[in-house]
Amino acid sequence: VAVAGGHNLIMIGPPGSGKSMIAKRIPGIMPSPTLEEFLDILRIHSAAGQTMNGGLRFLQRPARAPHHTISDVGRLGGGTIPGPGEISLAHHGVLFLDELPEFKRSALEVLRQPLEDGHVSISRSAGKITLPCHFMLVAAMNPCPCGYLGDPKHECRCAPAQIQRYRARISGPLLDRIDLHIEAPALSI
């Protein structure tokens, strides 16, 4: 449903519940980009000095998965000569944020406006640019710091206050921009 409608998605579940595996499969089931979308993708990647190698790149949309330690410039774009960051490189594709609460709160808050508007404006001394960033946000997180809240096979070691602080790292306004919230139960294999 999320892929068909291009809805932003967050998956909450313990380690090993398949959250990351599902997120990595999403670009492969998205419809191929139109020619116009593909040209947009090429322009952005070219502006970042990246190439789209291989014939299969035409069939799939971009999938970006930045680490939670990424800099603001790497995430949003910028630099001395402004250029695209991860959110623009995910344009017409997927931006996967694994372990969402591990990202700095300020790093998550700056996603709100681009998610709403579909573009990001970057102002630097060398100039101002506006880059497109219409992407499907896919996020994953554990239900608590230890990861095992609600897992029938593991005991959660977290105090209620720890769980509350952990979940408070993600603001209500950001969660409001995520259309589908899914609980991913532990898998028994």
Question: Can you describe what each PLM-predicted range is?
Answer:
Residues 1-6, 14-15, 87-90:
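Phosphate-binding P-loop
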Residues 81, 109-131, 150-168:
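Substrate-gripping "pore-loop 1 plus following alpha2 helix"
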Residues 98-100, 125-126, 139-144, 161-162, ...:
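A short beta-strand-to-loop transition that corresponds to the Sensor-1 phosphate-sensing loop
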Residues 63-66, 83-92, 122-142, 153-154, ...:
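AAA+/SF3 P-loop NTPase mechanochemical coupling elements
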Residues 9-52:
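Walker A/P-loop
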Residues 40-42, 148-189:
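Conserved AAA+ ATPase core "coupling" helix
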Residues 38, 75, 90, 98, ...:
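Conserved RecA-like P-loop NTPase ATPase core
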